[in-house]
Structure formats: structure tokens, C-alpha cells
């Protein structure tokens, strides 16, 4: 893959009015009749699993990851496998995803998974979320991570790309 093991950061890569549009849609407004459909999730990193840290938040899925991409290293993936759009709000993020593709020199960007999380400020003891892998198996993918507002800490990116007993930090990114 062209960007294997690279961490590329684009600061302020979308226009301010587009940033505000995303923020306005996600936060909604009762006065304007625009309530965004957030759904409770028990833990944004490892919900309902033994690894859960029980850090609740709200979640919204735009594109559902195909089942065959949630498996283990021996899974065989179809080359045209792509996620199913589950939310009308997906189109809100398409211009940003196209911009990511453009900045990376990619002419065709397929979305395998799209989701948003609204985390509550429960990380008051300085601990960080457990390491996790966004897509298991043999899929080659790029993660486009966008912060709508301040976060409760850095995003930690590890060297390991498979489940491991120990993890070493590659980079810590302050949003």
C-alpha cells in the first residue's frame, strides 16, 4: 500500500464554513428542528466486550463495515467489497473524504466504514483508551480522523498493526 505505516496530519484542511456546517449538523438545534440521531454506546473503543473501559458516549454510523472485514488475518476479502451507506448524514462528510483523497493523491476513495462519536469528559484520571485496530483482517485502508471540537487528550498511534500483548507508541497527536 502506498501509505503503509505513514502518519500524515493535515491541520485546518477544510474551510471554516464547512467546519461549522459539520459542527452545526452534529450538535443539532431544537429551535431549528435539527436533532442529530445519536445513539448510546457503552464504550467507544471496545463496546460490550471484555476489554471495555466503560467510557460511554454517543455514536452514529454512516457506513457499515462489511462483515467479511471484521474477521481475522485469514479472511479473504473481495476486491470490490465496500460498506453500505446507512445514514443520510454520510453525504455531509463526502466533500471532506474527497479532500483527503485529493491531498493524498488518490483519485478513487471508497468508504469502508464511517462513524462519529460524541465522547463525554470521563477521562479525568489521565488514562488513555485501550489500543484498538479499526479494521481487522487483510484490508488495506486509511483512517481519516476529524475532530469537530476539543478532545479529552491526545490520539495515540501505536507501531503494532495487529493485536499484541504489548504496544509501543509511534506517535501521539494533539488535536
Residue ranges of predicted features:
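Non-heme Fe(II)/2-oxoglutarate
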Residues: 1-108
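Catalytic core of non-heme Fe(II) oxygenases with the double-stranded beta-helix
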Residues: 75, 79-175
